[in-house]
Amino acid sequence: MPIVDHNQAPEVPWRPGYRKWDVAGREQGASSTLSINTAEPGTGAPLHTHTMDELIVILDGTLEVQVDGVTHTVGKDHTLVIPPGCEHAFRVVGEENARLMVFFPTLDPYSNGQTRYLEGSRPDSVRA
């Protein structure tokens, strides 16, 4: 059973102003994916869908979240439960960076066929 020191987790190239560290996945023998993310105000994720659930735990900061066309402002100590096929996007609002924990019940959740971008482009590490 691997025990992962978050400070030793590899950083994955993502988006300008948005940093991502994979803390659990294939390298740890898991069949799911867990990452810690930090995002600066004004950054986030463009509108997209996944073929599987996504859980986003807001550890710090505030997000403006668009889910199936409805916009919500969601802060620290809340969890976004995003079912398969749900159109969603978010951006950090306010002056504080956001810190997020993101879970997928699969490996390679951003690969072709698993994630469809409706706006914007794929993150740097998963460009086709």
Where are these regions (language model features)?
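Conserved short histidine dyad/triad with adjacent acidic residue
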Residues: 34-49
